[in-house]
Amino acid sequence: MPMTATMAPYTLFILDDDTPLNPREDHDCLGKMVCWHSRYSLGEKHDYDEPSDFLRNLLFSEYSSGHDRNNPVFAFLKSGKAKDARLEYNRSTREWELRENQHWSSDSDWYVSSSYAASLKDEVPDWFLDDCLSALTTGELFSLVEQMDGMVILPLYLYDHSGITMNTCGFSCPWDSGQVGWIYADKAMIEQEHGKITPEILEKVRQTLEAEVKEYDYYLTNQCYGFQFFKEDVEVDSCWGFLGEIRDVQDAVKEHLPEDCNPAIVESLQFQYEELDIDEYLERLQEETEELDCEPG
């Protein structure tokens, strides 16, 4: 809804931005936003068919070619805490065996789906790591991703009812909302931006990701604005691409005012509830000014 204010000779308009820039495509963001939805294209583009594919890729990139059989993925499988998979040493064959649960009715439900020779010691094949990751549930994969060194990852929730809105904490209505993905920054991304990683830096990154989600939510909820500034009937300045609460937009507009314009013009902005035609509005102002000038003193 447009807003207008006049302090002669200036008139200020704050207007809806009908062609706003997508902050996930057009802004320099620290985090990457990976989402899945049947009707909406959200966040950055990606090629992951399912959330588990994304999580497996993060873990494979972190631990492949490291040839360390004591990495967190193998340690988790050895602990017996995984729901449907475990990693065990077979003394007879001298192999490490990945066993998976077929969900039948006895101990025979567990079968060997993959193995590698213990003689390789720490030279664990990457294909075996891939097999192990494929045996884990999405929840187990996410738990391991959270433990990655230097990783900051936050869930993304979408509420879809007469429009869409997004946050990182979830919504109270389970029928119209649910998790659609994550926003994350890994160790390499954080080091490139901040250098050495410390607990304070990780908290700063978390706050940055929260702010990026909030900015994207402004875009999704059409809280996108621009302004046009006129001196009498001549446009002297304009700017578009403001995202945020209207109060924040008003504060940002103050920075664009000419020196001879009273900043109070921003505080005097009023919503226009009828359709606004700027040319007609300015013409009407001019007529009113001329009428006042013609009145006998």
Show where each model-derived region lies.
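Acidic interaction surfaces
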Residues: 1-297
